[in-house]
UniProtKB/Swiss-Prot annotation:
The chain crosses the membrane at residues 27-47, 108-128, 146-166, 197-217, 233-253, 265-285, 308-328, 352-372, 399-419, 434-454, 472-492, 501-521. It is a multi-pass membrane protein. GO terms for molecular function: antiporter activity; xenobiotic transmembrane transporter activity. GO terms for cellular component: plasma membrane. The keyword Ligase does not apply. The lineage of its organism: Bacteria, Bacillati, Mycoplasmatota, Mycoplasmoidales, Mycoplasmoidaceae. This is Uncharacterized protein MG447 homolog. Keywords: Cell membrane, Membrane, Transmembrane, Transmembrane helix. InterPro entries: MATE_fam, MATE_MepA_subfamily.
């Protein structure tokens, strides 16, 4: 059992972190570290994409690469797709474009992996913060034990499921058409190109999926550490790990024949290093008696199935959001490829390739905004545990302002200020398509403003036991608003025969969903929050959550 001195040390640390009279500074103290944590965690994939695009294909940066345009053609000639005839000059279907296509069709699976990664850990973090706010040591220990076991088991089960459907998902992302026996050489090469992209993409995502348990446990340790008021060490690890990631990707891509797969191997190595850093830190805290994450007192007897259900209900909103966005990306890319074939004489993946950079940056900035919200979520959960509803209202206003400021900074830097330079130097956008790609980038990255205002409602409902509302707002952008808009934009694009209209879908969807979400959240906060918490008889779901957390 913890000694009285150990308990006092932990309580002092928590009070210093959470109970400052300057609430806005408390928000920043938690939001800034989680912003950088989320930014650099998302940058793993972002940096991988850049390094792969720059170093995998044969070029000045990698003159020894075996991934050349000629090698691609020779492989096509030796494949079952080639039925004879002269091979046309494919200016778009090059080794470089193959790499970009692989990254694009893999992106939705990477997004769903992120959804899986944060599902149970985030729910555990919210419950853990609430129990610390209440000061109930029994429930604190129950949350720690249940969260650790649940994260491990959930990781193993989901890895098996996603591995089983990964290849078919990649094929759907590319809208792979049925192979025909008598087609023109141009179509033959397109079929070969698509099949090659799916094969490489499968190897890439299999590695990331197979080891996804490592980043899941790292996330768990980060969320729980922050719930105890710790910021410095847990926030420093991701940036340092990201630097290692750049080094490993360079070595494996530049000096091996692994190609795109090399970046996945590098990511797993870095995930493992990050995980071990947190484990060593946790052991150090245990030895000094400065953490509730006790390894010595861990017991399977404290694992509660009912608490796991509570954790799942809370974390499900974040899973729904990331998962639905993965489905959104899949359908958007599939419809875009179909519209490209129908309305233009470009290759199937022409516009898909142009959007590689803009979509990657948009995903990065959205992840960073959700990092800000994670820091806020920790504070709100603690305040909720203490019953400080007035502070929760003030935090909501501060959160909206902070998220908009961060969104504006990200957009001005990454879209406006450095937009063209990023597209040219990091994503190898050609001079011929730079103006169009930059136009798309400005449009697509504008989503970050609406993500910033809409996501505050999800955070509010998650932390205040209103899980049904949190599920609704989390599905707003990826399903509820997106599905009708998808068909509306498709119809308008076909009617006007202007495919650039379809590019606006992502931002229009984010704008409408964000405005609806913030309206729902603000109405509940100002008109229903006080009445709801004053009620003695609450819904069964809320009673269940309050009983076990």
């Amino acid at each position: 059992m913890d000694s009285q001195q150990d308990r006092l040390a932990k309580q002092v640390l928590i009070q210093k972190s959470f109970e400052s009279k300057r609430l806005f500074l408390t928000i920043l103290r938690f939001a800034i570290p989680t912003f950088f944590f989320a930014l650099f965690s998302a940058a793993y994939v972002f940096v991988d994409q850049i390094m792969v695009i720059k170093f995998v294909p044969h070029g000045p940066l990698n003159p020894d690469s075996i991934f050349t345009d000629q090698a691609l053609i020779e492989e096509f000639k030796a494949s079952a797709f080639y039925k004879g005839g002269d091979i046309p000059n494919h200016t778009e279907l090059t080794a470089s474009q193959l790499v970009k296509t692989v990254l694009n069709i893999s992106q939705p699976i990477v997004v769903i992996l992120n959804a899986i990664t944060i599902f149970v850990p985030l729910g555990t973090g919210v419950i853990f913060s609430k129990t610390i706010g209440k000061g109930d040591e029994k429930k604190i220990k129950d949350a720690w034990n249940t969260g650790l076991v649940s994260t491990t088991l959930f990781a193993l089960v989901t890895q098996i499921i996603v591995l089983a459907i990964a290849k078919e998902w990649l094929q759907f992302n590319l809208d792979k058409v049925d192979e025909q026996h008598h087609v023109q050489v141009a179509d033959q090469f397109q079929h070969f190109f698509n099949e090659k992209a799916v094969a490489i993409g499968s190897e890439y995502v299999y590695i990331l999926i197979g080891f996804n348990i490592i980043p899941m446990l790292s996330r768990l340790f980060f969320y729980l550490g922050q719930s105890e008021g710790r910021q410095l060490f847990i926030a420093i690890v991701p940036p340092l790990s990201n630097l290692l990631n750049v080094l490993f990707v360079f070595l494996l891509v530049r000096f091996s024949t692994l190609g795109v797969v090399g970046s996945a191997v590098a990511a797993i190595l870095v995930y493992f290093i990050t995980f071990m850093a947190y484990v060593v830190y946790l052991i150090s805290l245990n030895k000094r008696g400065l953490t509730y994450l006790s390894l010595r007192d861990f017991s399977f007897k404290r694992v509660s199935f009912n608490l796991f259900l509570v954790i799942s209900m809370v974390g499900l909103a974040s899973f729904f959001r990331n998962g639905s966005l993965s489905i959104l990306n899949t359908f958007y890319e599939s419809f875009l490829v179909n519209l490209t074939k129908t309305l233009t004489d470009q290759s199937d993946t022409f516009y898909l390739v142009l959007l590689t950079g803009p979509i990657a940056i948009a995903n990065l900035t959205s992840a960073a905004i959700f990092g800000v919200l994670q820091g806020v979520r920790t504070v709100v959960s603690y305040k909720f545990g203490q019953g400080q509803l007035a502070d929760i209202k003030r935090i909501n206003v501060y959160t909206l302002l902070v998220c908009l400021v961060f969104a504006a900074l990200l957009y001005l830097i990454l879209a406006v200020g450095l937009g063209k330079e990023i597209l040219v130097h990091l994503f190898d956008t050609s001079a011929a398509t730079l103006m169009l790609a930059n136009q798309f980038s400005l449009i697509v990255q504008a989503q970050v403003f609406f993500v910033a205002i809409g996501a505050t409602s999800q955070q509010y409902f998650q932390n205040n036991n209103r899980v049904l509302y949190s599920w609704i707002v989390s599905l707003m952008q990826g399903v509820i608003v997106f599905v009708p808009l998808l068909f509306i934009f498709q119809a308008i694009t076909l009617q006007t025969k202007n495919i650039e209209i379809f590019i606006w879908l992502l931002t229009a969807n984010a704008a409408l969903a964000g405005l609806i979400n913030v309206l729902i959240g603000q109405v509940h906060i100002h008109f229903f929050m006080d009445k709801y918490f004053a009620q003695k008889h609450k819904s069964r779901i809320v009673q269940f959550i309050e009983r076990y957390s």
